[in-house]
């Protein structure tokens, strides 16, 4: 039922239900709270600008959702961190979304549909998405992963 209601809301142009009951920071907190546990700790440090356009909010929420889903499905991480804020690079102000984990890393595997979808949504807003190791390989060969999206404001 929830998925059907969500699909109807998206078709009607209302955006995700998570954004209809509170602001983006609250939606992100609810998402992180729902994903915490099961041997994994996720920290959230979210300071998005207050006046983001709805399409940008949707991309932020979907990017974090997919990154956390990838962590749960593929990384064997015990810790993750979601950081959202703004940076100014010269005359350009950017919204920065960084999701980092201490898991196995990508191991050079090709990009799947989840990452491709994230990249497509971010690039549609004129932004970039990078996926890199979070650190040098440890004794087990794990590198963790950092997914960073940058969207011009």
Q: Language-model features: where?
A:
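Conserved transmitter core of two-component histidine kinases
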Residues: 40-47, 96, 128-132
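Glycine-rich G1-box
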Residues: 104
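A short, flexible helix-to-loop-to-beta junction within the catalytic ATP-binding CA
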Residues: 15, 39, 75-80, 107, ...
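Conserved DHp (HisKA) dimerization/phosphotransfer helix of two-component histidine kinases, i.e.
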Residues: 1-13
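Helix-loop-beta hinge of the Bergerat
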Residues: 8, 17-58, 64, 68, ...
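Short beta-strand/loop element within the Bergerat-fold HATPase_c
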Residues: 79-92, 96-100
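Short beta-strand element(s) in the Bergerat
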Residues: 56, 93-97, 143-145
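ATP phosphate-binding glycine-rich loop and adjacent ATP-lid/helix-beta elements
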Residues: 31, 107-135, 142-150
